[in-house]
């Protein structure tokens, strides 16, 4: 089978290509230029080309910067401006990696696209990886169901520690295998504020108010805060911690309260992506990547692609713009963005 492999020059994508080639498939690699971080692509392309030579495969360089800006970067900046907390990786997987790159793979005669994600496809469902510490099912929950037949994830049934061990036997990787584990958002060097500062003045001091709208303190600019944050603002004469409950971007104002005030049982979603036919069901949900699963009852409005999630217990720090993912056991059955 002819398979296109998304390649970054890192351990996971290299081992993905190696595993598939050793299984007898015809492999081509593709490196995606997604953003304009200085020096980032030159080093990665050098690595990818070395890996390509080692494996004896053709490597494509695909410039997707315009598409990445449209579907990932610009919404990231816009949502923070609106006082929300975006999830760029979920959008990138949907529109770029398993969108634009998949189209490129098909145009080049490939039957499948493979990536180094730690996730499985079982019975047509995105399913949690065998290695729970590396599971990326959450970030693939917005990928359309019809795409899943065209993608494979060879690392989904493997443990990261085993992949690292196998990688030690690959001489080309040993030259640059000391690179840190890639995590967080690829185009953010240190903090998201650095990105926003390129577009806006984020240092706009404003009022901190309580739930009733009374001014009780000052903050350094609303874009510095996300729901649940408890530092970086002043509450006059406060002796107990205060948490950000809401961000009123239009007023440059943050609403704060106690930890109990953060608690929420009803979560409304938009841009819902469904993997099942039912519009009412019981499930477990994650309101952000690292949060524990909570039992919930869900009602979907298919026409408007919205949902109401009733949690069985209070969740803290439910943030607009974050992805809520619904699971039946280990399989993803739906997802939507918190509104």
Curated annotation (Swiss-Prot):
InterPro entries: MnmA-like, MnmA-like_C, MnmA-like_central, MnmA-like_central_sf, Rossmann-like_a/b/a_fold. Residues 134-136, 288-289 are annotated as: Interaction with tRNA. Keywords: ATP-binding, Cytoplasm, Disulfide bond, Nucleotide-binding, RNA-binding, Transferase, tRNA processing, tRNA-binding. The keyword Mitochondrion does not apply. Coiled coil: none annotated. Disulfide bonds join 92-186. It is an enzyme of class 2 (transferase). It catalyses: S-sulfanyl-L-cysteinyl-[protein] + uridine(34) in tRNA + AH2 + ATP = 2-thiouridine(34) in tRNA + L-cysteinyl-[protein] + A + AMP + diphosphate + H(+). Its main location: cytoplasm. Its EC number is 2.8.1.13. HAMAP family: tRNA_thiouridyl_MnmA. It is found in: Cytoplasm. This is tRNA-specific 2-thiouridylase MnmA. It comes from Campylobacter curvus (strain 525.92). GO terms for biological process: tRNA wobble position uridine thiolation. PANTHER family: MITOCHONDRIAL TRNA-SPECIFIC 2-THIOURIDYLASE 1, TRNA 5-METHYLAMINOMETHYL-2-THIOURIDYLATE -METHYLTRANSFERASE. ATP binds at residues 6-13, 32, 116. Belongs to the MnmA/TRMU family. The record marks 117, 322 as: Interaction with tRNA.
